[in-house]
């Protein structure tokens, strides 16, 4: 009597899959109906256990004339997933793929979501790996990345995650760096900043190195979390990395991070460093540093940069005007505050930067 065993693991990358679009043959000697209702009945009545059922349906294609559809297989995998038998669902998917039977991507996504909800790290990594290489699929949605990240929320053990990411890094996937960057963002969205830093550190040792987008994304994540020391550490590492170059987005991100953390003293330091590197400040740069200097009480320097900004024909926003006016009032210079207020009133709205200008700057930098 043949022993049932799960088929060998398929190669993760480089393999090709032949999809059977509609129907598959089932052994003729099976006396029971090969419809999903028959399978459902067997599972619910206990006449056969799930292992025996898997043995029969996976070997259906060898001979026979009865027919079973992909819908039946899909429903069976979905039932396993709903019932919490996630390992059974995954094993069945693997077995079907070995038979060149590829189910819809939604089946994999649902299994990934269930694994993430149960914090099943090992299964989440396995399913995510399979979803990445499914033939003819659209780019993965944000939910797929978030569900992977959710599996690791309650643990510091990153063994399975590191193994998955290293495998992706060493793969031949043409979009592997995009995948790595989106994984980093997903872990940030789930507030796992320690794992974000871990991934960045590991990437520097792997084949798929972090690029400027990776670094800038991590800096933005750290800035939102108010982690000043970590921001400075990543910026220092980035400047030491010969494969990337800091740019205006890098410095604007750091400036905003320092401003949000109320480290106004560091804003002028970062601004001066940016200028010394030959990077010209833009609307976002001036807005961040002028606001920071004003809030720290450095009125003289904030007014100097405000004048420099206008000389370079960069239109200030209403926000910058109001920040400076407020700063002047707090310093007791009410006359200068009144003069600046009058200047704002006499300035056409066309000569002021609006929300669309900030968005335009962000879009141009991302390109």
Swiss-Prot record:
The keyword Repeat applies. The keyword rRNA-binding does not apply. Keywords: Repeat. PPR repeats lie at residues 69-103, 104-139, 141-175, 176-210, 211-241, 247-281, 282-316, 317-347. Gene3D superfamilies: Tetratricopeptide repeat domain (1.25.40.10). It comes from the Eukaryota. Belongs to the PPR family. P subfamily. PANTHER family: OS03G0856100 PROTEIN, OS12G0638900 PROTEIN. This is Pentatricopeptide repeat-containing protein At1g11900. It comes from Arabidopsis thaliana (Mouse-ear cress). The lineage of its organism: Eukaryota, Viridiplantae, Streptophyta, Embryophyta, Tracheophyta.
């Amino acid at each position: 009597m043949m022993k049932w065993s799960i088929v060998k693991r398929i190669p993760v990358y480089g393999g090709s899959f032949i999809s059977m679009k509609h129907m598959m043959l089932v052994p003729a000697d099976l006396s029971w109906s090969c419809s999903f209702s028959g399978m459902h009945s067997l599972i619910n009545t206990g006449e056969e256990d799930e292992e025996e059922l898997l043995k029969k349906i996976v070997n259906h294609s060898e001979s026979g004339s009865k027919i079973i559809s992909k819908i039946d297989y899909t429903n069976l995998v979905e039932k396993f997933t709903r019932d919490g038998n996630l390992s059974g669902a995954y094993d069945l998917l693997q077995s079907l793929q070995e038979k060149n039977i590829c189910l819809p991507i939604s089946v994999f996504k649902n299994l990934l979501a269930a694994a993430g909800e149960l914090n099943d790290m090992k299964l989440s990594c396995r399913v995510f790996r399979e979803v990445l290489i499914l033939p003819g699929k659209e780019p993965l949605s944000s939910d797929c990345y978030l569900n992977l990240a959710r599996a690791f929320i309650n643990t510091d053990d990153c063994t399975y995650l590191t193994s998955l990411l290293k495998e992706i890094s060493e793969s031949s996937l043409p979009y592997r760096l995009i995948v790595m960057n989106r994984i980093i963002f997903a872990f940030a969205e789930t507030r796992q900043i320690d794992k974000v830093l871990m991934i960045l550190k590991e990437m520097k040792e792997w084949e798929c190195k972090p690029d400027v987008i990776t670094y800038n994304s991590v800096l933005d994540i750290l800035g939102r979390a108010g982690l000043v020391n970590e921001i400075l550490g990543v910026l220092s590492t980035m400047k030491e990395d010969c494969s990337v170059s800091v740019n205006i987005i890098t410095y604007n991100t750091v400036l905003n991070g320092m401003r949000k953390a109320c480290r106004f003293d560091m804003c002028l330091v970062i601004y001066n460093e940016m200028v010394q590197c030959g990077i010209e400040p833009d609307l976002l740069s001036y807005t961040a540093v002028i606001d920071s200097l004003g809030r720290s009480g450095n009125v003289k320097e904030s007014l100097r940069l405000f004048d420099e900004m206008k000389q370079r024909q960069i239109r200030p926003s209403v926000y910058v005007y109001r920040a400076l006016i407020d700063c002047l009032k707090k310093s007791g210079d009410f006359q200068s505050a009144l003069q600046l207020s009058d200047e704002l009133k006499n300035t056409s709205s066309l000569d002021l930067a609006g929300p669309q200008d900030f968005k335009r700057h962000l879009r141009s930098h991302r390109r």
